[in-house]
Regions:
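Cysteine-centered catalytic environments shared across enzyme families
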Residues: 1-248
Length: 248
């Protein structure tokens, strides 16, 4: 298989070698452990046939902020989370496929120069600070977008989304139900955070705004006591004074 995984144990990436697999991971998981996810990767490998659907089902079951790369002698898989909080880059310019967590490594491997610049992407960066879609500043280098994965197998690379954020799809329901759903989602997120804290202190940069107030209120609702709120700025400023009242 002509796949080239250019990964290094740096910037938080860790490599695990099991059952002839190279498994790279960065980030953290919710509701499961890394050992369980590695076992899922082994199970996927031992089934023999890996399909886009089987990878999609696997990816949909993962929660947290993470990215992973899985390589065997027959296939390569790369997955980013629903936010793409940790980037992964790929290219098919040369024979086979290249995957890396660090775009400059692909740039060097492909020996790209200014003739390969994607000027549409450059315009997007100049106007907004980032590119749109899977583009990068160089034409041959692409990136996995939020909620997507790639599968390289039988000398073919396929990219697919396992999750699409579609807020424009409205669902008619009552205001009461919407409030209930929002409360349930918010408290579940906070429960995940409490589990990840594992008893450690939660430090909240508290202001007069609703965002930090929501976090403080939810931790209070869930009876998490190891909380410290901080504010900053000029003495007596409105934000700090209001935050003090909220904290008390």
């Amino acid at each position: 298989m002509n796949s080239y995984i250019i990964m290094k144990e740096e910037f938080g990436w860790k490599q695990y070698q099991v059952y002839g697999l190279n498994f790279w991971f960065k980030g953290y998981l919710l509701g499961t452990s890394l050992d369980e996810v590695i076992q899922q990767a082994i199970d996927l490998y031992q089934k023999g046939t890996v399909t886009m659907n089987s990878v999609s089902v696997w990816a949909r079951g993962l929660r947290g902020h993470f990215a992973l790369v899985l390589e065997s002698e027959n296939f390569a898989i790369a997955i980013v989370d629903k936010d793409r909080s940790i980037p992964l880059f790929y290219s098919t310019e040369k024979t086979g496929s290249l995957v890396s967590s660090y775009a400059p490594d692909l740039l060097q491997k492909l020996q790209l120069d200014t003739s390969s610049i994607n000027y549409q992407a450059a315009l997007e960066i100049a106007m907004s600070g980032y590119t749109i879609g899977c583009k990068s500043l160089y034409e041959p280098i692409l990136q996995l977008v939020a909620g997507s994965f790639l599968l390289y197998q039988n000398d073919k690379l396929k990219v697919e989304s396992y999750y699409n954020y579609q807020p424009w799809k409205l669902r008619e329901t009552s205001e009461k139900e919407l409030k209930f759903n929002l409360t349930e989602i918010t408290l579940n997120m906070m429960k995940d955070m409490i589990n990840s804290l594992d008893g450690r202190q939660a430090v909240i940069p508290l202001s007069a705004g609703n965002d930090s107030r929501l976090i403080a209120s939810a931790l209070k609702e869930l009876n998490y006591k190891n909380v410290h709120c901080v504010s900053y700025g000029l003495k007596g400023n409105f934000e700090a004074e209001t935050a003090k009242l909220i904290a008390e």
